[in-house]
């Protein structure tokens, strides 16, 4: 059944434009409270990133929960995976994240976790949508939900992150640059790595409500690359605004993306006897990852794009590790969703066990040339269903002769068509991608 409000990862949009408005978020809080109160008493955790609009939407959502009779626990600024973890440990019925992830400050969104710290099942999302279209009612005064704040939320999550590596772990002598994207990891990540012994230089850790992801973080790596070289660091780690994506930079300033990080963790887990089953990637995962894992006899399957689909595939197969090239990495032995800090720690442990630099360790995977072009579109029609787009995609696929892949898909979080072409010769791949993007752009116009 199609959804009216929910995308692939909650509800997201421009602040002040429907549905990211205070009145809608108030109604959403009420609908969530009503949905979960059907199971009895209800407590909901709310966390957010550092956007200035987060305070407005936190208050609105909290008011809606109270009107439904649900209690609220406020976490303040907290990485998305931290909210998932605390939802589990506090035995809450649900967790709420107010964030637009890697998007700029003038976007925001609401996404949810179940009491188990996983993304909401489809039937619960559909129930919330039905309630959103129903008249809002308020419980009697004596049954209004209560609100309290968890003051030690950051400390709890810091200790949880540290517990994901052996207690004997000591990164003494390791020089690391962290880019916190002026987002939700700005206090937590530096403390985690320093408490584990690393020498840490921190970038983009002064949020002002407007500078989240602004020329920093996992989608803007120039500053991190320069800082790693300037400080003669061993590596750099970049998080996105809500702390569920991670990218790295080696000591030469070369970018190490999610596919490569996933390979490093998988190889280490195999070598240490901790890998259960295989690895789940997505339709966007580089062919080089699949081939590198194949060389290690590690099974690999592709899920739809989105960490919720990666997680669903992991659960269905009872596997432990999956991720996306964007840096969402799920380590099921530790987490129930993509966790940037914990994924980075697993990579550092892999390097430590092998006695290698990041530049040396990444040589185990040879990525195939891949070009991704985003084309913005407006309107309700699906540009991917247009005959000229279908014909062009089929033509390029035929021209590549089985030596590459073509993938056209709509983003689940932004009004974009993603045009991806992958093959064994970069110039050819780029030419094909630009040709397809031009046709998609003409259709969208």
Curated annotation (Swiss-Prot):
Q: Name one GO cellular component term.
A: cytosol
Active-site residues annotated for this sequence: 101
Q: In the record's cofactor note, how is the cofactor described as bound?
A: Binds 1 Mg(2+) ion per subunit.
Keywords on record: Isomerase, Magnesium, Metal-binding, Phosphoprotein
InterPro entries xrefs: A-D-PHexomutase_a/b/a-I, A-D-PHexomutase_a/b/a-I/II/III, A-D-PHexomutase_a/b/a-II, A-D-PHexomutase_a/b/a-III, A-D-PHexomutase_C, A-D-PHexomutase_C_sf, A-D-PHexomutase_CS, Alpha-D-phosphohexomutase_SF
PTM remark: Activated by phosphorylation.
Q: Which domain of life is it from?
A: Bacteria
Return the SUPFAM superfamilies for the record: Phosphoglucomutase, C-terminal domain (SSF55957), Phosphoglucomutase, first 3 domains (SSF53738)
Q: What class of enzyme is it?
A: isomerase
Reaction(s) catalysed by this chain's protein = alpha-D-glucosamine 1-phosphate = D-glucosamine 6-phosphate
Positions carrying Phosphoserine: 101
Which coenzyme or cofactor does it need? Mg(2+)
Q: Which Gene3D superfamilies match?
A: Alpha-D-Glucose-1,6-Bisphosphate, subunit A, domain 3, Alpha-D-phosphohexomutase, C-terminal domain
**What positions does the entry give for Mg(2+) binding?**
101, 240, 242, 244
In Gene Ontology terms, what is a biological process of this protein?
Answer: UDP-N-acetylglucosamine biosynthetic process
Provide the E.C. number(s) assigned to this enzyme.
5.4.2.10
Which GO-annotated molecular functions does the record name?
Answer: magnesium ion binding; phosphoglucosamine mutase activity; phosphomannomutase activity
CDD domains cross-referenced by the UniProt entry: GlmM
The record's similarity note reads: Belongs to the phosphohexose mutase family.
> What is the documented function of this protein?
Catalyzes the conversion of glucosamine-6-phosphate to glucosamine-1-phosphate.
Record-given protein name: Phosphoglucosamine mutase
Q: Which organism is it from?
A: Pseudomonas paraeruginosa (strain DSM 24068 / PA7) (Pseudomonas aeruginosa (strain PA7))
